[in-house]
Amino acid sequence: MFKTLYARIAIYSITVILFSALISFVLTNVYYHYNLKASNDAKIMKTLKEARQYEQSAKPTHIQQYFKHLGQMNYQIMTIDQKGHKTFYGEPFREDTLSQNAINNVLNNQDYHGIKDKPFALFVTGFFDNVTDNTVGINFKTKDGSIAVFMRPDIGETFSEFRTFLAVLLMLLLFISISLVIASTYSIIRPVKKLKLATERLIDGDFETPIKQTRKDEIGTLQYHFNKMRESLGQVDQMRQHFVQNVSHEIKTPLTHIHHLLSELQQTSDKTLRQQYINDIYTITTQLSGLTTELLLLSELDNHQHLLFDDKIQVNQLIKDIIRHEQFAADEKSLIILADLESINFLGNQRLLHQALSNLLINAIKYTDVGGAIDIALQHSHNNIIFTISNDGSPISPQAEARLFERFYKVSKHDNSNGLGLAITKSIIELHHGTIQFTQSNEYVTTFTITLPNNSL
């Protein structure tokens, strides 16, 4: 029954309606018991005493006819003579519950207030309890002696039409309330069901079909965020497919080249050519090894929760070590590396920061013309650490500049790199809560600027 949200909301709402009706009935009964019962008793007692006064002044010939006439006026009456004989007038009582002690007291001229003294019952309204002890009683003097007269209004007869009206009203109230609860519950559940179907489509890989935002409440907000999530997942899926295609291409091309070189190696007996083929195969396998290393590093950066950033790094010394390591490559192109480094300490991951800065210097050496210069600077600026590396090189188009930090992107098709270096650098800098920017001047000087928070204070 409670397996669906629709049934749960509907049953909860109906239960609330019925429980509210029950509580309302109990509270009404309590209100009658403590506020209305005494005044109701007094009104009926007043009516009965007026009837006795009329009987004593008018002296009707047949007292029974007089009580019968009162019974026809929607009163229930019970008379008891000295011998204990009981006579009923009007509609019959549901049950005779009057005690003999109460009867004797009335015969001895004591008034009886059974309505006022009726004990409280939680689920029984005293006003409607049609029993003989729920009456008022007084002594009547007749020519045949004293009689005890007990009377209460005939609620059933007096309010018969009202009871019918009330019953119809309550039935309609419950029917309409329950119908509206079911309808309103359906209006709430319908967009949730559509959201469920959209989620199932999402699981099946459909990232293109949006759901219509039909409301402005919390469900509408949920629909809006679902569409945003769908778009994000679609982008992630496209990136995944693009990544797989790029990796496949980066691996397939060198493997095809190796296969071709091995075929040539088998068919030639020329020692010079054989050595050249072996050297080419070695170069390609080295590139594949580098690609594998960088892919593993990218995976590590994407799942960085286990990484620690608490190494105390002397950044200026780190840069000097990188320059010394890459000096041979710079000397091969007769490049001059100028470094202006302030003494700066930084708290981070030394291995990753070394990789990021090395990538930038390797790129600068690679794309600087022979005999050119590379300028490196490290300095404080307010609460930040600023690292810049500039070099002379060929200009980069605005289209290429916009995609410079994308994974597997290459500025030139003839570039023998795998296009991951700058993407790795950007990820590392962002994990250190920093930023990296690329600019170029009219003189074809390209500059990478890294800004890191000065966290060594």
Swiss-Prot record:
Keywords: ATP-binding, Cell membrane, Kinase, Membrane, Nucleotide-binding, Phosphoprotein, Transferase, Transmembrane, Transmembrane helix, Two-component regulatory system, Virulence. It is found in: Cell membrane. GO terms for cellular component: plasma membrane. GO terms for molecular function: ATP binding; phosphorelay response regulator activity; phosphorelay sensor kinase activity; protein kinase activator activity. Residues 246-456 form the Histidine kinase domain. Its EC number is 2.7.13.3. Residues 186-238 form the HAMP domain. PROSITE patterns: HAMP, HIS_KIN. Autophosphorylated. It catalyses: ATP + protein L-histidine = ADP + protein N-phospho-L-histidine. Coiled coil: none annotated. It holds the Pfam family HATPase_c. Gene3D superfamilies: 1.10.287.130, 6.10.340.10, Histidine kinase-like ATPase, C-terminal domain. Disulfide bonds: none annotated. GO terms for biological process: osmosensory signaling via phosphorelay pathway. It is an enzyme of class 2 (transferase). It is a multi-pass membrane protein. It comes from the Bacteria. The chain crosses the membrane at residues 9-29, 164-184. The modification Phosphohistidine is found at residue 249. Member of the two-component regulatory system HssS/HssR involved in intracellular heme homeostasis and tempering of staphylococcal virulence. HssS functions as a heme sensor histidine kinase which is autophosphorylated at a histidine residue and transfers its phosphate group to an aspartate residue of HssR. HssR/HssS activates the expression of hrtAB, an efflux pump, in response to extracellular heme, hemin, hemoglobin or blood. PANTHER family: HISTIDINE KINASE, SENSOR HISTIDINE KINASE CPXA. This is Heme sensor protein HssS. It comes from Staphylococcus aureus (strain NCTC 8325 / PS 47). The lineage of its organism: Bacteria, Bacillati, Bacillota, Bacilli, Bacillales.
